[in-house]
Amino acid sequence: MMHLAFLVLLCLPVCSAYPLSGAAKEEDSNKDLAQQYLEKYYNLEKDVKQFRRKDSNLIVKKIQGMQKFLGLEVTGKLDTDTLEVMRKPRCGVPDVGHFSSFPGMPKWRKTHLTYRIVNYTPDLPRDAVDSAIEKALKVWEEVTPLTFSRLYEGEADIMISFAVKEHGDFYSFDGPGHSLAHAYPPGPGLYGDIHFDDDEKWTEDASGTNLFLVAAHELGHSLGLFHSANTEALMYPLYNSFTELAQFRLSQDDVNGIQSLYGPPPASTEEPLVPTKSVPSGSEMPAKCDPALSFDAISTLRGEYLFFKDRYFWRRSHWNPEPEFHLISAFWPSLPSYLDAAYEVNSRDTVFIFKGNEFWAIRGNEVQAGYPRGIHTLGFPPTIRKIDAAVSDKEKKKTYFFAADKYWRFDENSQSMEQGFPRLIADDFPGVEPKVDAVLQAFGFFYFFSGSSQFEFDPNARMVTHILKSNSWLHC
């Protein structure tokens, strides 16, 4: 009898250790995910037993708070939509407050800030990382009095680095997906710094995690902004891969938040662009949303985009999303209409306008003295009587001129045409239409306009990544 009892005792641990069913395992996994998520982003105290009690009012309230903040149906339950959102990639900063700012509204007490890129991800060329960070800084610079300059050594206000797992700040990264990056609010030392998880696949486009978008979001934190519950805002905590990076601009929610800390940008000390006469009405005027619309020339000017067509141009800026429509002669009475090409050299604060075998230089509203000049003074051969398009690469200080199926490259530093040109457009810009009407550089891409289409060209991958309608820049 004792022998039988001993067998029964031996069996008890075995019988109580049957594996959980698939559904039970999944439920436990979901609870673990939710517990970690709410602890990390919604200030839930670490208490496993409490979380396992289904009727815990605190847990229900935390889930409801998360659902409300992220725009989900507020059920207080770990439903499918809630769990799906918990698995999405996002910023590693908690969602514990309103969009406006961190508790106590920390802000920088100065308007000129320094930044330093401490190290680089192996996923991208160094110049691509530099460009993404510069563009992200410009997003906030354009709507505030803030300015930024780069340091290459020493301690900057904003130290930017790539790291994996535990990296010395008590906020470990978690591998690919989930937490993409985190940043600290304004202040000394670690404060203001940005850390990117280098286990992510960082890209210039939407094929992986877009570095520009994440950097712009994290910079919002470095400047004092917290997360926004507005799903259209850059400061919304979940990563949103904009399919059309060319169309990116801050939401009004983002602008309101950052300007509540620093105010709007100061009025320009330069002459504002003011038209001298209004646009006449008439059927000959181009319609911005005409599906067949093409452009004569495109240029940037002091942070704005100018799209020229016939006697007119559209003017688009980040701070005024609705394009303005003007006569060319209303701003520059001495310039011709029906232009061939235009481009800006940022370092000289000058836009160059081309028509036929002549070109003009403008700064703001002023056409510069000594113009027009002949295009052959730039180094073109006598056989070239006009150019079709031009664009200046501000990082490389090179200007590209396109004529028929060839292009030339001009060095802005030496002010001379480079040797080895012209070259065939098809050889160096594969996939682009040979007849180029205009070219624009933005967001790390070149946009080649040909008729009613534009070709988004990635210069690092040397390939066309998107084909869009030319007037998509005008919100059509």
Curated annotation (Swiss-Prot):
PROSITE patterns: CYSTEINE_SWITCH, HEMOPEXIN, HEMOPEXIN_2, ZINC_PROTEASE
Impact after mutating E142Q: In a breast cancer sample; somatic mutation
Named cofactor requirement(s): Zn(2+); Ca(2+)
SS bond partners: C289-C476
Pro-peptide positions on chain: 18-98
Motif (Cysteine switch) on chain: 89-96
A GO molecular-function annotation: zinc ion binding
Annotated Zn(2+) binding sites: C91
EC top class, as a word: hydrolase
Record's keyword terms, sorted: Calcium, Collagen degradation, Disulfide bond, Extracellular matrix, Hydrolase, Metal-binding, Metalloprotease, Protease, Repeat, Secreted, Signal, Zinc, Zymogen
Hemopexin repeats: 286-335, 336-382, 384-432, 433-476
Database matches in CDD domains: HX (cd00094), ZnMc_MMP (cd04278)
Catalytic residues in the record: E218
Binding residues annotated for Zn(2+) 2, in chain numbering: H217, H221, H227
Compartment annotation: Secreted, Extracellular space, Extracellular matrix
Cofactor binding note: Binds 2 Zn(2+) ions per subunit.
Name of a matching Pfam family: PG_binding_1
BP GO annotations: collagen catabolic process; extracellular matrix disassembly; extracellular matrix organization; proteolysis
Catalytic activity of the protein: Similar to stromelysin 1, but action on collagen types III, IV and V is weak
Secretion signal span: 1-17
PANTHER family (UniProt xref): MATRIX METALLOPROTEINASE, STROMELYSIN-2
Domain note: The conserved cysteine present in the cysteine-switch motif binds the catalytic zinc ion, thus inhibiting the enzyme. The dissociation of the cysteine from the zinc ion upon the activation-peptide release activates the enzyme.
Function: Can degrade fibronectin, gelatins of type I, III, IV, and V; weakly collagens III, IV, and V. Activates procollagenase.
Record-stated family: Belongs to the peptidase M10A family.
Protein name: Stromelysin-2
Gene, per the UniProt record: MMP10
